[in-house]
Amino acid sequence: MQLFCWTKAASALMAAAVISLCIPTWTVADVKEGDTITKANMDQAGDLLIPGIKWFVERGMPVKVVPYKKVELPKLFKEATEKYSGQVKLSADGHEIYNYVAGLPFPAIDPNDPMVGFKIMWNQEQKPQYVDNVGTEWITELVNGRGELERTYGSQFWRRMMWTGRLYTDPKPVVPHNPAMRYTEQFGPLFIPNDLKGAGVLNNRYLGVDVPDDSYMYLPELRRARRISVANRSDAFWGADMDLDSLWGFNSKVSYWTFRLLAEKEILAPVHIGTYANRKVWCAQPDGKSGPLAFMPCNINWEKRPVYVIEGVPTAYSQYAYSKRIMYIDKDFWGMNFSEVFDQGGELWKLWFNMFEYVAKPYEGYPVKPLEGGKYNYEDAWAFTPHGMMADLQTVHSTKWDAPSGYVQPTDWVNEWYFNEATPINTERAYSVNFLIQSAR
């Protein structure tokens, strides 16, 4: 808010009187296609820039504005939403949904509903980004505030299989399991660095409100998979800035949090970035000279996006690194544009930052090397997420990724982004501790 004072001289009969009016006004954001927001003109964007992104712009990141492009729900997902959402019920505490089959559980959002925060988060949990399965190879770099590359991790896989809400591959809509599961995901095995070669993480998310995630980390030097305690899910792993609960912006159980809707608004976010697996998205390469520009994106598109701003506060942990999250959930596709994480003192600490290329196919000839058995018949747009990061804004440090690797040619990619493919790696057997260990050998 800015304060302007207006002074008006009185008439001749009241020459001695002066009326001083102080009128509060708010800066109105005025951003249009073709604008580039920088530190010099960032006031022009106003609250279209969230606090975490303002931190980046103040340190040199430009924001190139392109027109908003609506993201449509996938056809089968939209049909399932229309067919089944009317029967879905929310528990009184918001921790559980009943009668869910597929699609969005709560497509009609009423901001005056006292449970609106939980309903939005359940939509985020069953978002159309991940319906049956999804995966990609990835490379991650740890870069400090001087722009130095500290460490590199690479893997041929991050992959997730949904056990509920399935629409494309058999069995559907549910893969039977006791206890019932929502999804399983695997990170790894790593192929770099050498001291962690073969390491991987497996996470099982159960439907039961009080059933904690089953999470395991396989470390080759120990020759066994170690269970990750729920109490450690906010701890950074492998020396990176990210933690299990922060992956993709929010990766915790809905029932372990309380949520409230703070606002419905527009923000600037990268949803159609205009590139894919391209190292040139970054303002600079890690050279020890570029400072934080080495983990900032300069060459991507930003657009005004309608979002729900949700505050999440953890309630089920005896020890937890964060006091709260502020999450920016896209109204079109229910994915997380950004997630701001706050320390126990209430100060902004970290930012999770997704860069989407929401298209049916990211380039002509996609994919160069398809998965065995993959069809890639994508008529709908999907949430390709070729770049992103989690940045520590207090220590000026970042863990950024390219997925797939931007260091190699497409012919060298092993597994680039796929969605809803009926392949051997997307079966129940391929998401187990035994498979995690075997895949590392």
Per-region residue spans from a language model:
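N-terminal secretory signal peptides that target proteins for export/translocation
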Residues: 1-7
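Extended beta-strand-rich segments in extracellular/periplasmic secretory proteins, especially
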Residues: 85-88, 92, 153, 158-159, ...
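Solvent-exposed N-terminal domain segments of exported/luminal and surface proteins
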Residues: 30-213, 219
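Short, surface-exposed coil-to-beta transition loops
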Residues: 197-198, 211-212, 320-324, 337, ...
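Non-transmembrane domains of secretory- and envelope-associated proteins
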Residues: 26-108, 222, 233-269, 273, ...
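Bacterial N-terminal signal peptides
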Residues: 11-22
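A short, surface-exposed beta-strand/turn
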Residues: 204-209, 323-338
